């Protein structure tokens, strides 16, 4: 079979990235056309995005959604298993982003080199009866290894950390970056967007509104009582009865458990988490592009409280979280909830710090 011009080289290059045995040396041998050679004709330059844990429950759906994002020009999909299959599947979508797959520890550095945004959903999922802290022993080591790769290969990338428990893994990542001398607190972002999405959805149900018209600030952390919806600051301005406040707060805090139990051992909140992760990643990319007033909630290094990390609204820009907003006025219910959240968060953050320092 004959191909015109450089078509054969392009096809060979793309095919190489669908094979688990791919190496940079193979790319150099198969093509002299460079990294951008198989970008869609006429496509915008866009950004280079890596998903670490792309073959997992969250990762597969997230890979699909990021392939659809017009701001992505190059999408690297990394995992320790099944990365070639996910890469092949997603690569058949006729959108502009070029997809490249990477399999196993030996290819981690290649997956990360030159990335603008790194999204990390890697780790084991929650199962019935498990808390996010039950995941710590396994996921802590995974996050450490991946962040060591980030520090070495793309130290200037913005990192979106999804791996649970986020209240601890963000601290782990920070300590890894500090050891490597690459830590920039503005660029390490714990993803809490699903808490906001749930809050918007559940509040909209109570108010009889479209969730897209509702904005609920959710502060604190990303587990149980550390998730604190500020219902007094809901937009559009609304009032709730004490029973509604109790119902909404409890449901938002336990949204993950609701899904785990509903799936009866068949998984966790992978679909809604992938949606939330893609939404937050898109906000980060718009910030990188220089869009004005890109505001989302995120678990970040913060001086809002005495804790080293705290989830609040942040303004995203070219350097990451360029502004961290204060909490604003709280009612008595929220002030009590804040103290409970801080007490729980302090231990979780310290657990992450100790994992690296001890």
Swiss-Prot record:
One of its GO terms (molecular function) is L-malate dehydrogenase (NAD+) activity. InterPro entries: L-lactate/malate_DH (IPR001557), Lactate/malate_DH_C (IPR022383), Lactate/malate_DH_N (IPR001236), Lactate_DH/Glyco_Ohase_4_C (IPR015955), Malate_DH_AS (IPR001252), Malate_DH_type1 (IPR010097), NAD(P)-bd_dom_sf (IPR036291). This is Malate dehydrogenase 1, glyoxysomal. NCBIfam families: MDH_euk_gproteo. One of its GO terms (biological process) is malate metabolic process. PROSITE patterns: MDH (PS00068). Keywords: Glyoxylate bypass, Glyoxysome, NAD, Oxidoreductase, Peroxisome, Transit peptide, Tricarboxylic acid cycle. One of its GO terms (cellular component) is glyoxysome. The active site is at 222 (proton acceptor). Substrate binds at residues 126, 132, 164, 198. The gene is MDH1. NAD(+) binds at residues 53-59, 79, 139, 162-164, 273. Residues 1-38 form a transit peptide. It catalyses: (S)-malate + NAD(+) = oxaloacetate + NADH + H(+). It is an enzyme of class 1 (oxidoreductase). Belongs to the LDH/MDH superfamily. MDH type 1 family. It is found in: Glyoxysome. The keyword Oxidoreductase applies. Homodimer. The keyword NAD applies. Its EC number is 1.1.1.37.
